[in-house]
Amino acid sequence: MLVAEGGANILLELDHRGVLYRCNVRDKSLKVNNEYTYKNYRYINQVVRPLLGDCIPEMELVDIPYDRISGIIGDFVGDPDSDHVSALTIKNLRPTNVYGEKIRYDDHFTKVYHDDTMEHILVEIKPKWLHHAKFCRNCTHNNLKNRKIPYCYALMVVDPSHVSDMLLHTGIAFPRKFLIKFVDYFSKSDNILAKLHDIQKNLDSNVSMNDIKSIDDVSDAFLLNMTLKDVSCFIEWTREPDSLEVNVVDVDMKLVSKLDHWVNTHIQLSNSSNLVHH
């Protein structure tokens, strides 16, 4: 069963053991996608996991017979040039038997899910650019796209109390126990936003977008930084035993083919007359 699809990947549920299969469909060639998946698996484990540790969920590299999922994968790729589809297994971080199908809140940066009794609450965030020396990249981009979002994850790094503004903006009557736990987590110096910010800042000191003049200027550090500026964080609260679990996904190896898009967006934002500073 197809669970979700994005620009480059699809998520499949093939059994009922709480595991999803993440298949790359960027290219029409199965062989090309399989090669990327193998490289990406090594990249996640050798490059990203050492930076974020236990926040990266465990993954397994598997090969699925093409015939088993041809009815699904065939809609995304061309004629099969491989007898298998390479995939990464990952824990289902939003099981429908807990959260159902309904999204309780949804904007460009945040989604909220919860069960009917609010025993389980899941906040999915895309913090994006947490470090940018010249201006707030997230808020400036919001202005450019006319997105009316009154909170900013980059601001939460310097003012953790701002997390309350985000929660209030959702309009959800969260349990007090959840609010205390959630706000307390983001007040700690090792919360996931602080970690991502510090890594982004360190990588920016090596090479920033302003340094990129051509493809020859693109380094592994730059591509890693672009990966970390596009992750998703799943923060799940369970009433009993009043615990938070944080998982970071979408940590795929970025391809240099995106360079023109990144540079053009950066130029457009830098030339904006409506820059935002925090």
Curated annotation (Swiss-Prot):
InterPro entries cross-referenced by the UniProt entry: Ins_P5_2-kin
Species per Swiss-Prot/TrEMBL record: Candida glabrata (strain ATCC 2001 / BCRC 20586 / JCM 3761 / NBRC 0622 / NRRL Y-65 / CBS 138)
Placement of sequence motif EXKPK motif: 124-128
KW Chloroplast (keyword) present: no
Keyword Transferase among UniProt keywords: yes
Job description of the protein: Has kinase activity and phosphorylates inositol-1,3,4,5,6-pentakisphosphate (Ins(1,3,4,5,6)P5) to produce 1,2,3,4,5,6-hexakisphosphate (InsP6), also known as phytate.
Protein name: Inositol-pentakisphosphate 2-kinase
GO cellular component, one term: nucleus
Subcellular location: Nucleus
Primary localization: nucleus
Comment field on protein domains: The EXKPK motif is conserved in inositol-pentakisphosphate 2-kinases of both family 1 and 2.
Coiled-coil features, chain-numbered ranges: none
Catalytic activity: 1D-myo-inositol 1,3,4,5,6-pentakisphosphate + ATP = 1D-myo-inositol hexakisphosphate + ADP + H(+)
Pfam families given in the database record: Ins_P5_2-kin (PF06090)
Enzyme Commission code(s) on record: 2.7.1.158
Recorded name of the encoding gene: IPK1
Family of this protein: Belongs to the IPK1 type 1 family.
Keywords associated with the record: ATP-binding, Kinase, Nucleotide-binding, Nucleus, Transferase
GO biological process terms, semicolon-separated: inositol phosphate biosynthetic process; nuclear-transcribed mRNA catabolic process, non-stop decay
